[in-house]
Swiss-Prot record:
<dbReference type="InterPro" id="IPR036871">
    <property type="entry name" value="PX_dom_sf"/>
</dbReference>
<feature type="region of interest" description="Disordered">
    <location>
        <begin position="1"/>
        <end position="44"/>
    </location>
</feature>
<dbReference type="GO" id="GO:2000786">
    <property type="term" value="P:positive regulation of autophagosome assembly"/>
</dbReference>
<feature type="compositionally biased region" description="Low complexity">
    <location>
        <begin position="63"/>
        <end position="73"/>
    </location>
</feature>
<feature type="region of interest" description="Disordered">
    <location>
        <begin position="54"/>
        <end position="73"/>
    </location>
</feature>
<feature type="binding site">
    <location>
        <position position="134"/>
    </location>
    <ligand>
        <name>a 1,2-diacyl-sn-glycero-3-phospho-(1D-myo-inositol-3-phosphate)</name>
    </ligand>
</feature>
<dbReference type="GO" id="GO:0032456">
    <property type="term" value="P:endocytic recycling"/>
</dbReference>
<dbReference type="GO" id="GO:0061709">
    <property type="term" value="P:reticulophagy"/>
</dbReference>
<dbReference type="GO" id="GO:0034727">
    <property type="term" value="P:piecemeal microautophagy of the nucleus"/>
</dbReference>
<feature type="modified residue" description="Phosphoserine">
    <location>
        <position position="40"/>
    </location>
</feature>
<dbReference type="GO" id="GO:0000407">
    <property type="term" value="C:phagophore assembly site"/>
</dbReference>
<keyword id="KW-0967">Endosome</keyword>
<feature type="modified residue" description="Phosphothreonine">
    <location>
        <position position="38"/>
    </location>
</feature>
<dbReference type="InterPro" id="IPR004148">
    <property type="entry name" value="BAR_dom"/>
</dbReference>
<comment type="function">
    <text>Involved in the regulation of endocytosis and in several stages of intracellular trafficking. Together with SNX4, involved in autophagosome assembly.</text>
</comment>
<keyword id="KW-0597">Phosphoprotein</keyword>
<comment type="similarity">
    <text>Belongs to the sorting nexin family.</text>
</comment>
Length: 437
């Protein structure tokens, strides 16, 4: 256990996250990384969420709230946007009802996936199938193969440390269910991935193993082309706008990794403190049996400490189940984005090498071969898709972290309110004893 309050986040490089320019902020490559460019609101998340969202006048209460007692209104503001989006969607997917299956060779969990859609690609308006984790992994692999130019959402980590995390515990299964539900909803909201044939099969096929054994190859021409890029070409210079994206992702992942490690230490200390509280409160209760006039106040203190320990347990559970999974998801998200960026670099390197070979030909006006033009088309497609997915990812990140941090603030307010009420409740009791004397 750490011997004091967590230290401030250590520096991870010469550039802080807030000082780094937004990768897509400028209209040109130079503006994207220029030292004079103004950081976008998305990268100023640590300072504010916008002038209208979290203005803290006189005393720090967010504008629009009368007191900490109305803290739940912080989360209520976020529901309106979701309701509006739901009116325009034509595909809804829900992951629920986890079930444990015990077989001779293995034990595993399956999840029910319910799909409702009005799209013509679906023969029925509603489907219900059961899938296990390795089926989700299969889907993600197929999406990476068939849509190499797009950012594929990450899955939660498959492996857990035996003896430390029980992968069949109710808490672990529920955390994984939420992550898998988020994974499918990310795909559902994507304008390209949601129409992928592998995704359709995943949502509708009763027996997915039959498709796996057939080894169906539904790769697009783009997927085949990128799949056979061996990486033997060396990129000379990454364009400035994509270099800015790479730098941002590196710094972003480092910051989240640091927050994740510190948050885990905080949770560990809170759990240890909770153990001490549970031993601390009953001492006053047993002491009260030896006292006369002090018996009632001592029982009150014992009950107060018990209420505080219950509130702390709820706060710790919220951090474990809601806060940490989002951090880890976005750390994995940044790795996925780096992978797509690397594929884009390989295509550009191939194009530059082929173009240079044409330029070296001893001809006055060498004709550009068709394969070079196709390579250029692939590179331009990669650039466009990567920019669009990066912008979509930034929007999702802003929404997710805004909700995460507001939820964290709300839970902390509730925790301290409960502790305050617990301690205030014994004051009248102590005053009565003093007046009686």
């Amino acid at each position: 256990m750490a011997g004091g309050p967590p230290k401030a986040l250590p520096s991870t490089g010469p550039h802080s996250l807030r000082d780094m320019p937004h990768p897509l902020a400028g209209s040109s490559s130079e503006e994207a990384v220029g030292g004079d460019s103004t950081p976008s609101p998305d990268l100023l998340m640590a300072r504010s969420f916008g002038d209208k969202d979290l203005i803290l006048p006189n005393g720090g209460t967010p504008a629009g709230t009368s007191s900490p007692a109305s803290s739940s209104s912080l989360l209520n503001r976020l529901q309106l946007d979701d309701d509006i989006d739901g009116e325009t969607r034509d595909l809804f997917v829900i992951v629920d009802d986890p079930k444990k299956h015990v077989c001779t060779m293995e034990t595993y969990i399956t999840y029910r996936i319910t799909t409702k859609s009005t799209r013509v690609e679906f023969d029925l308006p509603e489907y219900s199938v059961r899938r296990r984790y390795q089926d989700f992994d299969w889907l993600r692999s197929k999406l990476e193969e068939s849509q190499p130019t797009h950012l594929i959402p990450p899955l939660p980590e498959k492996f857990v440390v035996k003896g430390v995390v029980d992968r069949f515990s109710e808490e672990f299964v529920e955390t994984r269910r939420k992550a898998l539900d988020k994974f499918l909803k990310r795909i559902t909201d994507h304008p390209v991935l949601s129409f992928n044939e592998h995704f359709n099969i995943f949502l509708t096929a009763k027996d997915l193993n039959a498709y796996k054994k057939q080894g169906i190859a539904l790769l697009t021409r783009m997927g085949e082309s990128v799949k056979h890029v061996t990486g033997g070409y060396k990129l000379r210079t990454r364009p400035l706008e994509f270099a800015a994206i790479g730098d941002y992702l590196d710094t972003f992942a480092l910051k989240l990794g640091t927050i994740d490690r510190i948050a885990q230490r905080i949770i560990k200390e809170e759990i240890e403190y909770l153990v001490e509280l549970r031993e601390y409160g009953p001492v006053y209760s047993t002491w009260s049996a030896l006292e006369g006039e002090l018996a009632e106040p001592l029982e009150g203190v014992s009950a107060c400490i018990g209420n505080c320990s219950t509130a702390l347990e709820e706060l710790t559970d919220d951090m474990t189940e809601d806060f940490l999974p989002v951090l880890r998801e976005y750390i994995l998200y940044s790795d996925s984005m780096k992978s797509v960026l690397k594929k884009r670099d390989q295509v550009q390197a191939e194009y530059e090498a082929k173009l240079e070979a044409v330029a070296l030909r001893k001809e006055d006006r060498p004709k550009v071969p068709a394969d070079v033009e196709k390579c250029q088309d692939r590179m331009e497609c990669f650039n466009a898709d990567l920019k669009a997915d990066m912008e979509r990812w930034q929007n999702n990140k802003r929404q997710d972290f805004r909700q995460l941090l507001m939820g964290m603030a709300d839970k902390n307010i509730q925790y301290y309110e409960k502790c305050l009420m617990a301690w205030e409740s014994i004051i009248p009791l102590l005053q009565e004893k003093q007046e009686a004397k």
